């Protein structure tokens, strides 16, 4: 299976404050930002027991620049309706107009946040498909995280550096009837 797509987002507008007493308009922000992205996602079964998933996205932001965002994974289809998956993906979040240009914490020099995500999961269907359960282990390594921090006694949005996050997720669901299911 091959999926190809394109995204376009336009952000912008004009802001101002109006003094109630005098009616005076005080100019605020008049900014525009555009984001273009093209992507390709590919999934291929390699026999009955293995699937390959791969994708790439190129994201261009009018103020931040261009970034390549890859992802890839393998799915192992095991006996007894069990499945194991391994995945690696990159994530990206561009700064918003508010974070860059509006209100006292604004900072026009912000860079995009970047994440690398690693996942390993196991799942199984049982009881003729009525029962489904799974567990997912993940690790996230992030850089350039945007936070509001005091700078010279005033709040300012800055790229603060690195983060690490890891954890375990689990899920279980049971289909009681064709109309009822509990999770």
List the predicted regions and their residue ranges.
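Residue-level detector of conserved, well-ordered beta-strand and adjacent loop positions
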Residues: 5, 98, 111
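Feature captures outer-membrane beta-barrel proteins of Gram-negative bacteria and organelles
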Residues: 1, 27, 35-45, 67-77, ...
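Membrane-embedded beta-barrel scaffold of Gram-negative outer-membrane proteins
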Residues: 77, 83-85, 112-166, 171-182
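Face-selective signature of the C-terminal outer-membrane beta-barrel domain
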Residues: 1-64, 77-79, 131-137, 183
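A structural preference for long, well-packed, hydrophobic secondary-structure segments
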Residues: 18, 33, 50-52, 66-69, ...
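Extracellular loop and loop/strand-boundary signature of outer-membrane beta-barrel proteins
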Residues: 21-29, 55-60, 102-108, 153-159, ...
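Transmembrane beta-barrel architecture of outer-membrane proteins
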Residues: 8-14, 30-38, 58-70, 88-92, ...
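Outer-membrane beta-barrel translocator domains and adjoining extracellular loop/strand segments
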Residues: 14-23, 64-70, 97-103, 145-153
């Amino acid at each position: 299976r091959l999926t190809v797509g394109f995204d376009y987002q336009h952000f912008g507008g004009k802001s101002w404050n109006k003094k109630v007493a005098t009616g005076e308009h005080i100019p605020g922000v008049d900014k525009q930002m555009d984001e273009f992205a093209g992507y390709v996602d590919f999934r291929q079964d390699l026999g009955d027991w293995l699937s390959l998933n791969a994708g790439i996205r190129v994201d261009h932001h009018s103020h931040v620049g261009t970034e390549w965002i890859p992802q890839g994974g393998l799915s192992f289809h095991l006996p007894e309706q069990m499945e194991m998956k391994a995945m690696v993906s990159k994530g990206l979040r561009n700064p918003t107009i508010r974070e860059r240009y509006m209100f006292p914490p604004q900072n026009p020099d912000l860079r995009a946040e970047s994440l690398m995500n690693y996942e390993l999961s196991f799942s199984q269907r049982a009881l003729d498909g009525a029962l489904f359960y799974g567990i997912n282990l993940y690790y996230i390594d992030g850089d350039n995280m945007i936070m509001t921090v005091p700078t010279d006694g005033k709040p300012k949005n800055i790229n603060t550096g690195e983060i690490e996050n890891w954890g375990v997720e689990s899920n279980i669901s049971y289909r009681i009837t064709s109309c009822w299911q509990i999770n």
